[in-house]
Every structure is written in C-alpha cells, then in structure tokens.
Amino acid sequence: MADGPVAELLLRRLEASDGGLDSAELAAELGMEHQAVVGAVKSLQALGEVIEAELRSTKRWELTAEGEEIAREGSHEARVFRSIPPEGLAQSELMRLPSGKVGFSKAMSNKWIRVDKSAADGPRVFRVVDSMEDEVQRRLQLVRGGQAEKLGEKERSELRKRKLLAEVILKTYWVSKGSAFSTSISKQETELSPEMISSGSWRDRPFKPYNFLAHGVLPDSGHLHPLLKVRSQFRQIFLEMGFTEMPTDNFIESSFWNFDALFQPQQHPARDQHDTFFLRDPAEALQLPMDYVQRVKRTHSQGGYGSQGYKYNWKLDEARKNLLRTHTTSASARALYRLAQKKPFTPVKYFSIDRVFRNETLDATHLAEFHQIEGVVADHGLTLGHLMGVLREFFTKLGITQLRFKPAYNPYTEPSMEVFSYHQGLKKWVEVGNSGVFRPEMLLPMGLPENVSVIAWGLSLERPTMIKYGINNIRELVGHKVNLQMVYDSPLCRLDAEPRPPPTQEAA
C-alpha cells in the first residue's frame, strides 16, 4: 500500500466525503504531522489517476516564541507595571528584572509610569495610573485563537515590528477522487529482481514509476586536506601583502638553476647523491642561457663583483645534470633572471608554495617530498632591517608575534638569519624559517643593477601544519597511510591566533 496506514486513512476519508479534503484539516483531525499526510498524497499521486491533488498556498498569522510567552504571561510593559509597588521601586532594581529594559521603555511611552530622579537613593520609578489594559496580550490572544482578521493592519504591523507576530505561508493540498479512484490499491514493486526476470512474473506486476527528478544521496566529497587549508592561508597572506606568485612547474631542474646560479660550488655536500635525486633519463639539460652561464662560470672559478670566487675548475657537464629540485629557490633564480632582462628595473615581490625533493631517510619528521614556502623582495637599497621588518609583518599575519633572529650561513645569502618563535605547546623556541640577503655573486651575473638588493625567506609547510593539528608523525599527514576520517573531520586552522608572551630565557 502506498505510504501505509496514512494513505489508507486518506482514501477512506475521501470515499466518505462529498467533494474533497484539505490536507491540513485532515492532519489536524487525525492528530498527526501535516508532512505525513503530504507524503501519503504524493505516494497516491504516483499510482496514476487514483486521486487528484491541487496545491494551495494560504497566508496566515502565527505567534513567535516570544509572542506565545506574552500571550500567556502578559507583555513586558505590563509585567513592569505590576512589579512597581505603591511606594515606588528603584530604577536600578527594576532594570534587573527579566522584562526590565524592554518593559520600562514601553511603559514610559504608554505613560503608565514616571521616574523621580530627585530621590535620595537614586532614580525611583512610580506608577502614574492605578490600572491599565494589556492590549498587546489581548491582541496576541486573538491571533492564537484564530481571529487575526479582527486586528487592523497598523496593529499587526506593530506586533511584527516587536517580533511577536509572523506571517507564514501554509502550503496544503486539496485532495479529490480521481478517475481511477479505489480504496484497495495493490502494492507497487520498486525493484526488478533476478527471480522476476527468470520466471517472467515481472510482466504481471505493477511497478512504481521511476522518479528521474528525485535527489539522490550526495557523494561524500569536498573535504580539504589540512595541508591544503594551511597552504591557502599562507597564499592569502602573501597576496594581502602585495606579492605575485611565481611559476613553479619545474619539478625537474638542472643543476645549474638549482645550485650554480645560486653561487653554490660544485663540490658542495648538498650536491652529493646522498642528498639529491639525480635523473637517469633525461640525464642532462640541453638548453641553458649560455651568456649567463659564462658569467656564472667566471664568478665561481675566478671571482668578480667584489668576490674572490671559489677558485676551482667549474664544469659545464656538472651544471647540466638534471635532478628533482631540492628547493624552490631555483624558481626564484629563474624569476630574478627574467626580471634582470627587463629594462629599466622595476621593484617586485614574489612568492611560491610548492613541492621539493630531498634524498633523506624517511622517519616520523622527515619525508623525501615536502612543501617549501618562499618569499622574495627585490628593490633598491634593501638591508637586513628591511628583511626583519617584512618577516615580522609576515609572521604577525600568521598569528606568530614572538620572534627571534639568529645568525646563520647559506651559500647564496649574506647575511643570513634563522627565524625562531616560541611555541606554547612545546614550551620552547623552535625554528620556523630561514632568511637572508642574496649575495652580489648571485645577483650581478644575472644583470641586475648594482644598487638592487634582494631579501628572501623560506619555511616548510608541513611543520606548522603538524604543530597546529597536533600530529606527531608526518606519515599521519602525508602518504598512503593517512586516515581519511582525519581529513573529513579536520577543522579550519588558525596559526597561533592568540599568542602569549614567551619566557625571558634566550633561544638556544
């Protein structure tokens, strides 16, 4: 039977009626939810011409939750009036009543009460009239009794303004008998089973029409991984600071752009196979800007631009070796080289957030593939002070305000600084980034003007994400062992939104 007992009741009531039934009135008579009757109507409609149902919309007035309370207990102003004894009541005490603030204002405008500000113990409230009529309660009781039409438009408007009354649209069905009306309806099949097909019984069974407009179950999708959430926050911060995103689609990079262009010598330990993934095929880069390559070679082997260089035999074959980039600073080098070819020079602010690769032993805190965040600013006369100022602005936007700087060494920056922040959870200072001013030996061979300085800084994406989501093992954040439920449940993350002052001890 379509929709079970409710549909049966509907058909029996419809058989006994002369013209038809209103679904809302039927629900009230049967003492059930209107939606249950509507469901039965729609189920019977699916059977064909058993019934006819006309959708009707009617407007009516209903009391809000506050309006229901006032209809029972009286208006706020009436309650305030009744609470004032003949000798008056201190205004401060009156305001502490649940209806005090609203009721006092309305009672004053109705001229039911007055305030004597000359009283010794402070302003005191007295009655002005001996009695009053609570018109608000009376009007609301009329609405509750189904007599809202007795109220004028002005009275209804006043009640709506006080959010005591609401106009609602009630959608009901007027149900009448159809051309194929019957009180005994056979059950319609909703599934075609293998047994029906093999026996041929499907030919004699009625099937429920397929509803192509029905909404199916929405697929469980749209959950952002914690790394993507934090990455979006970093990216938004850079954009708010006026930075432009660099192209970082070169996962495979030549040793020239990854190392040599950064004034990193060819015998540096970082270029060893134990730290870098070198490619077997294609093993070498075929296209390099040879005029720039020659300037880099001369700087490495002979010096120049105020530098003695490294005094070794620089080899082009070594620079051609392809690898998986170990940092996104190679993308910064490419961007700065393109900038140097544009005349005249224009100050820029670049950033990038992308993956890098290191030949490291995998453990709870290290991966062979991770994300690097990098910011670069190029302008005339930039100094270490500018770098520290930009770093403070950047990390403050992250919610990290307690910063310390420690001198460090990088092959391609001088001076260089490590950035530390006090971590409340670990109760100690932790490194959150590295920074520095790019060396002239890196910038001048590109063709940048001598009075142009470039400040830069970088940090990983995984470390702050692990800290903020309370993850101790990086393999729980990235990789095939990640619990997808963690991705579904993870909330939006704000980095140290309410930082606290750190202790006074120096960073280690």
From Swiss-Prot:
Record PTM Phosphothreonine, positions in chain: 190
Superkingdom, taxonomy of origin: Eukaryota
Keyword Protein biosynthesis: yes
Alphabetically ordered keywords of this record: Acetylation, Aminoacyl-tRNA synthetase, ATP-binding, Cytoplasm, Ligase, Magnesium, Metal-binding, Nucleotide-binding, Phosphoprotein, Protein biosynthesis
Classification lineage: Eukaryota, Metazoa, Chordata, Craniata, Vertebrata
Pfam families for the chain: PheRS_DBD1, PheRS_DBD2, PheRS_DBD3, tRNA-synt_2d
Cofactor(s) recorded in Swiss-Prot or TrEMBL: Mg(2+)
Residues modified as N6-acetyllysine: 311
Modified residues (N-acetylalanine): 2
A Gene Ontology molecular function term of the record: phenylalanine-tRNA ligase activity
InterPro entries noted in UniProt: aa-tRNA-synth_II, aa-tRNA-synth_II/BPL/LPL, Phe-tRNA-synth_IIc_asu, Phenylalanyl-tRNA_Synthase, PheRS_DBD1, PheRS_DBD2, PheRS_DBD3, WH_DNA-bd_sf
Keyword match Signal: no
Similarity comment: family membership: Belongs to the class-II aminoacyl-tRNA synthetase family. Phe-tRNA synthetase alpha subunit type 2 subfamily.
GO terms under cellular component: cytoplasm; cytosol; phenylalanine-tRNA ligase complex
Listed name of the protein: Phenylalanine--tRNA ligase alpha subunit
Enzyme class: ligase
